[in-house]
A protein has these predicted regions:
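Alpha-helical transmembrane segments of integral membrane proteins
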Residues: 1-18, 268-273, 302-328, 332, ...
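Membrane-proximal extracellular/periplasmic loop immediately following the first transmembrane helix
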Residues: 47-101, 220-225, 458-519
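Short, strongly hydrophobic transmembrane alpha-helices
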Residues: 14-42, 46, 294-295, 339-342, ...
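Mid-to-C-terminal secondary-structure elements
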Residues: 101, 114-137, 146-281, 442, ...
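Interfacial "coupling" helices/loops that link adjacent transmembrane helices in transporter permeases
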Residues: 294-338, 706-748, 752, 765, ...
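Membrane-helix entry/capping segments
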Residues: 1-20, 109-112, 141-144, 217-224, ...
Length: 815
């Protein structure tokens, strides 16, 4: 306790020094605490389910591609799922689920609900029970059952928390569903950017109103997500081997649909964070670099401070203080500084987390759970003590070995620095330069990558377009002709609104992150279904390309005459033509998109036009081959409406709701937002990477510059008498300035050389995050080297200016 009080008293006597060290620590610790808070919530915090480590996601991939599947859960057909469930001996249970939005029409206005159709086994598999009511029963997956489970938020918002709602019927999509339970407040599954508000069983998928074959009977129609719970003590490798055997048997048994399917098991948490994982790892590494720069900077400051205290420490040693006592005293001081930096860093991180959450892409799971918890506090405390100890260890050890004779005889200054001390401080400066260069290069590469991504032409003009989704209840609009008639009336009403230039409808809009792909056949060269190529398919109305300002480069656009009674037609993208009709005129070619949503045998469609490529998923990836079909010939109940108008999107959204209500008040309008938001969202992750790494690089650059300035300033102070002698012997001011600057820039050059090696080592980490630029781009490397060199030169030049103004008489007076 006495050592603690003495250390605290010593630090309080030097508030400027203590404040600089605490601020330096706080910048590094704050950056790491903020990043760790995200990693803790997204990746490390256990999922809120029973034995979450036993939960796995099952992903399918095309074996023809020869690559592993992405780690986010892909889809499976219901017949394949049934076979997996029956034949495996490694899972305790399995379940599937799929997004199934519903419309609640019991209130004054139709309300869109984010819903999921799930296996009855899902909730027991997750180990979560409703807070009131019961879970789904196994037989409620069968056709004819209409039961629903409410989320806690929907229960409170729509039903006022009335416990009597359990057992009552509500109207969803024009049908009566019995509410059987309410889930806990913190429960959400699947975990994502659109949390479910209501769950129904698979029974709603296993029957159709028009008598067509339901999707759940079509092997090869992969639309369900699949998870499973491993049996106790079952290694995932053994489960993988068992499922590989089953999948191989299915490939032989069903060659038309399963011939090329492979299957991969992933831990559920791994699958959930797959998209965010590379960026989070990179941010963690960059934040660690900032902390290391700060640590080295503080070590340099403590080393200089210990040298100025050599006389004090020598007196202590002469009076009987042992080396351990001196080391302990100095380590306590550095630990206190680290603790102060930790508290300030935690405050910085808390302030910055709200801004960080606003910048994070919405597709990153569990964003709302990001907050400092006990794990974050423990991490901050550990890092604070660790950096305090690391920064103070070498200075403390060096200070505990004083030369008593020199220290006690020196009455003019605390002590002169040894050659070993100068080398140590030089090494610290080199390390700071290396880390600063690595961070600067990373920030420049990510920034250039982001700029190039923004320059990608998406194939459409998003300005002044408002989008919204309209979902028609299947009970009211069971037939395609009814859906087509509704959309036709709606667009006719919308196009007459003031300020509206054009309007259209589509299955999916560009850069929404969603797609539908169909196998298709070319009439002139038919192939077995397992060998048929795949293309993105979109269902659009005749003004779709006009509204997007996309260009029909060959042939014609769709017209109102392309209705259900007209010959079946299609428009394809330029990429489609390049891949499947190279050197040929595609107009008049006949293709057959094998879409399961189309009743009966899929019709042959004649290609009547070619449109420019449109980025449907992301700007980063090249557009896939695309097929467009007229909505009148392939009418669907859920469409996105696009309205080109210079009015505020809020006004357009309100006018669109009024137009829908004029036709049918039980049809909801939701997700009203500008198309430009989707474009911005598609580059949210690269933008975040560039911003955060740029901020970290700026901090590291300032700390490195401060380190160079501090070392050179201290060197000038230590060499004052030497400089005075040089002046006395005839040296000019320019000579002294060149001496000091060259000494500092020599360290910078060494740091840059090692920094390039560090940049090349980071190539693998950065490459997956870059677009249109290599991780070792020489122009970028040269640019950041020049920037770092100029700032380091200024940091050397300022002490050199002070050295050139030394008065030789004053400098030599003590000699």
């Amino acid at each position: 306790m006495r050592d603690f009080r003495n250390s605290l008293r010593t630090l309080l006597k030097q508030p400027l020094f203590s404040g600089i060290v605490i601020l330096t620590f706080a910048l590094g610790i704050g950056a790491n605490t903020a990043v760790f808070s995200v990693i803790n919530a997204v990746m490390l915090r256990p999922l809120p389910f029973r034995a979450p480590n036993d939960l796995v996601s099952i992903a399918l991939y095309d074996m023809k591609e020869g690559i592993e599947p992405p780690t986010d859960s892909s889809a499976v057909s219901y017949p394949d799922f049934v076979d997996w469930r029956a034949q495996n001996h490694v899972f305790e249970s399995m379940a599937v689920y799929v997004n199934r939005s519903l419309t609640l029409t019991d209130g004054a206005a139709a309300t869109h609900l984010q819903g999921e159709a799930v296996s009855a086994a899902l909730f027991p598999l997750l180990g979560v029970q409703p807070i009131i009511g019961r879970a789904f029963l196994a037989d409620e997956d069968e056709p004819g059952h209409r039961v629903a489970m409410l989320s806690y938020g929907l229960w409170q918002r729509q039903f006022g928390g009335d416990t009597g709602v359990v057992g009552k019927s509500i109207t969803l999509g024009g049908e009566k569903f019995q509410v059987v339970g309410v889930m806990p407040a913190r429960f959400s599954f699947p975990i994502g950017d659109f949390p479910p508000e209501i769950w129904t069983t698979l029974s709603i998928l296993r029957a159709t109103r028009d008598g067509s074959r339901p999707m759940t009977e079509e092997r090869g129609n992969d639309f369900l997500k699949c998870i499973a719970r491993l049996k106790p003590n079952m290694p995932i490798q053994q489960a993988q081997a068992n499922m590989d055997t089953i999948t191989a048997a299915l490939r032989k048994q069903y060659p038309d649909s399963d011939a090329n399917l492979g299957m991969k098991l992933w831990p559920l948490i791994t699958a959930m964070v797959a998209d965010a994982h590379p960026a989070l790892v990179m941010l963690c590494a960059m934040a660690g670099c900032v902390l290391l720069v700060g640590c080295v900077n503080v070590a340099n400051l403590l080393l200089a401070r210990s040298l100025s205290r050599q006389r004090e420490l020598s007196i202590r040693a002469a009076l009987g203080a042992g080396r351990w006592q001196i080391v302990k005293q100095l380590l306590i001081e550095s630990a206190l500084l680290g603790a102060g930096g930790g508290l300030a860093g935690l405050l910085f991180a808390t302030w910055g987390l709200d801004a960080l959450k606003a910048l994070l892409p919405p597709r990153i799971p569990r964003i709302n759970e990001i907050s400092p918890d006990i794990h974050v506090l423990v991490f901050t405390a550990f890092v604070s003590l660790l950096v305090g100890a690391l920064a103070g260890l070498l200075p403390a050890w060096r200070a505990s070995h004083p030369n008593l004779a020199n220290s006690l005889n020196d009455t003019s200054r605390g002590s002169s620095e040894s050659a070993r001390g100068r080398r140590t401080r030089a090494v610290f400066v080199v390390v700071e330069i290396v880390l600063a260069l690595v961070l600067l290069a990373s920030a420049a590469l990510l920034g250039e990558s982001f700029l190039r991504l923004q320059q990608v032409r998406p194939g459409f003009d998003s300005a002044s377009i408002t989008t919204a989704r309209v979902a028609l209840p299947e009970s009211t609009y069971p037939k395609p002709a009814q859906a087509a008639e509704f959309v036709r009336k709606l667009l006719a009403n919308v196009t007459t609104l003031p300020g509206v230039n054009s309007a259209a409808a589509a299955w999916w809009i560009p850069l929404s992150g969603s797609e539908i792909t169909f196998n298709f056949d070319v009439q002139e060269r038919p192939l077995p279904k397992s060998e048929q190529p795949i293309a993105q398919v979109n269902v659009v109305t005749h003004d779709y390309f006009k509204t997007l300002r996309a260009n029909v480069v060959r042939g014609r656009d769709f017209t109102p005459r392309d209705d259900a009674s007209a010959p079946r037609v299609a428009i394809v993208s330029e990429g489609f033509v390049k891949q499947f009709f190279p050197g040929e005129d595609p107009i008049g070619k006949r293709i057959t998109p094998n879409g399961s949503a189309e009743p009966g045998d899929p019709p042959v469609r004649e290609i009547v036009g070619v449109v420019n490529d449109i980025h449907l998923i992301s700007l980063r990836d090249a557009p896939k081959p695309q097929i467009y079909v007229p909505h009148e010939q392939f009418a669907i109940q859920s469409v996105m409406i696009l309205v080109r108008s210079h009015d505020d999107p809020r006004f357009v959204g309100a006018a669109l709701r009024d137009a829908v209500n004029e036709i049918d008040k039980d049809v909801p309008v939701y997700r009203v937002r500008p198309l430009s938001d989707y474009v911005s969202q598609s580059v949210a992750q690269p933008r975040l990477n560039a911003l955060l790494v740029g901020l970290f690089a700026l901090i590291a650059l300032l700390l490195a510059a401060a380190g160079v300035f501090g070392v050179m300033s201290y060197s000038v102070t230590q060499r004052t008498q030497e400089i005075g002698i040089r002046f006395a012997l005839g040296a000019q001011r320019g000579d002294v300035m060149r001496l000091i600057v060259s000494q500092g820039m020599r360290l910078v050059v060494i740091g840059v050389a090692f920094g390039f090696a560090g940049i090349f080592a980071l190539t693998r980490l950065l490459q997956s995050l870059l677009f249109g630029i290599g991780a070792t781009d020489l122009t970028t490397m040269l640019g950041v080297t020049i920037i770092l060199g100029l700032i380091a030169f200024v940091a050397c030049w300022l002490p050199a200016m002070r050295a050139s103004q030394v008065d030789p008489i004053i400098a030599l007076r003590n000699e």
